[in-house]
Amino acid sequence: IDGQIAHGDTFHDDRHPDLKADFILANPPFNISDWGGERLRDDPRWKYGVPPAGNANFAWVQHIVHHLAPAGVAGFVLANGSMSSNQSGEGEIRRNLIEADLVDCMVALPGQLFYSTQIPACLWFLARDRKNGKFRDRRGHVLFIDARKLGPLVDRTHRELTDEDIARIANTYHAWRGEKEAGEYADVPGFCKSAP
């Protein structure tokens, strides 16, 4: 893999403004309040709503969406609050993303997974083309997985997901997408739900 790593500012100096990626994986910093959002109110990346100047979470989401190719897929980690916050238009942005049929799956993770923060996290999976023929047609549905009770404590302040926990989450998502080798998907009360 060829690459170049350089210090930069993703929001204010996008080094790849025309990039359209087939796959995006990201772990952006959670809940950044000093990201200069007030200087980007009219940014073309904010197609689903202007993110609040005091929290960059939905700026990251929309930056990722902006760079997805027509059949692109993204997976990223954000603070758990991104699934429910309604402050400063965040709820409207989230609703617009769902109505645009971009949100494929949301996974609520247990707290204490990260050594750098105690903030609970979640996984977002987005897909531009949810009827692409490779998997079942998932248009109009979102898979919700509640993995908050998974993973043992490895010490007083940290939790880790086991290989079995990770496989359970992944297999649930793959089965829901219609991947034959993952088996048949079924809702499991308290763990997963496919919702229209």
Say what each PLM segment does.
Residues 1-2:
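Short, conserved SAM-binding/catalytic segment
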Residues 7, 12-196:
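A conserved structural/catalytic subdomain of Rossmann-like adenosyl-cofactor enzymes
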